Regions:
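N-terminal start-of-chain detector that recognizes signal peptides
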Residues: 14, 37-38, 55, 64-68, ...
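Charged/polar, solvent-exposed surface patches and flexible loops
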Residues: 80, 84, 109, 113, ...
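GST-like domain detector, emphasizing the conserved glutathione-binding G-site
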Residues: 14-183, 294, 304-307
Length: 307
């Protein structure tokens, strides 16, 4: 059976502009070796949207970092070693001089404060940028749903039951010393996906939700080159990654959001962005096969969403 070409278990949550960030405490961490790591370490997956976002951010900042690739296709994030680092089982994870940070927007907020130059969050506008990034996080499950239906299209269950069993059983179960409900929400999503698949109705709703968000972004880009004005910011990074994923899914940006499409093409030409979303040949071939089958069945995203 064909393996999935890019499933991801990431979450872009964060509190940019607030002082509270998700840094784990020692009791949360069972894989104790990371407490001795020095420098900037990133646990990530090539095809994870939130990992891609963080890598672009690191590129633009010029921050040296050590890579630890976590193979989500092999469900390595559901194994005891990784769950001992992040009990939520999500990538990316930052370990900086032994301190473990989770949730990509929180990681970015931490790195922006720790490595302030060049600025990617406009000074004095942290709360505004944080509020806009919240829209990205609120759409996390919508992006995952459309990705699995129109990009990855796995032939079997979205997540194997034995992997979910390991996910439920391992890790501390706490974040910042408090029992954490996030894992239960993740398991509920995957169990429903395994049972019902990614239905037309759910995908249509997710696509329409994105359309409303991109309508708003298109209006912004009608009068300015970047999402927050004249300078590139973390908002551009975050929404570039979502735009890239949805473009792979067949979302008709040129038709519906021409300003977003032009902005996306401009950023996609920059190596700091392009190299982090480049697809290996086998993934490109799989996507072409998926698209061909969906076209023959009248099940392209544009058709399902009634765009």
């Amino acid at each position: 059976a064909r393996r999935q070409t890019g499933p991801y278990d990431d979450r872009c949550a964060g509190r940019l502009g607030e002082e509270i960030m998700v840094q784990l405490v020692e009791s949360d961490i069972k894989t104790r070796e990371v407490l001795d790591w020095k420098g900037v370490h990133v646990l990530h997956f090539m095809g994870s949207s939130c990992s891609q976002k963080l890598r672009v951010f690191l590129n633009l900042k010029g921050i040296p970092w050590k890579s630890h690739h976590v193979d989500l296709m092999a469900n390595e994030n559901f194994r005891p070693w990784f769950l001992g680092i992040n009990p939520r089982g999500l990538v990316p994870v930052l370990v900086h001089d032994g301190a473990v940070h989770i949730e990509s927007n929180d990681i970015i907020a931490y790195l922006e404060k720790t490595f302030p130059q060049p600025r990617l969050v406009p000074e004095g506008h942290e709360n505004e940028v944080g509020a806009l990034l919240k829209h990205e996080d609120d759409l996390h499950f919508d992006l995952r749903r459309l990705s699995f239906r129109f990009v990855f299209a796995p032939p079997g269950p979205a997540k194997p039951p034995d992997a979910l069993k390991s996910y439920a059983a391992n890790g501390s179960g706490t974040v910042q010393g408090v029992k954490d409900a996030e894992k239960a929400a993740q398991i509920e999503f995957w169990e429903r996906a395994n049972k019902d698949g990614f239905t037309d109705a759910d995908c249509r709703k997710s696509a329409q939700t994105f359309r409303a968000e991109f309508d708003a972004l298109d209006k912004r880009l009608a009068t300015q080159p970047y999402l927050f004005g004249n300078e590139l910011t973390v908002l551009d990074i975050a929404w570039f990654i979502y735009t890239n994923r949805l473009a792979l899914a067949g979302y008709p940006f040129a038709k519906l959001h021409p300003n977003v499409n032009a902005w996306f093409q401009k950023l996609a030409a920059r190596p700091e962005f392009a190299k982090e979303v480049a697809m290996p040949p086998e993934a490109t071939a799989h996507l072409a096969e998926v698209r061909q089958k969906q076209a023959a069945a009248g099940q392209l995203l544009e058709q399902v969403a009634a765009f």
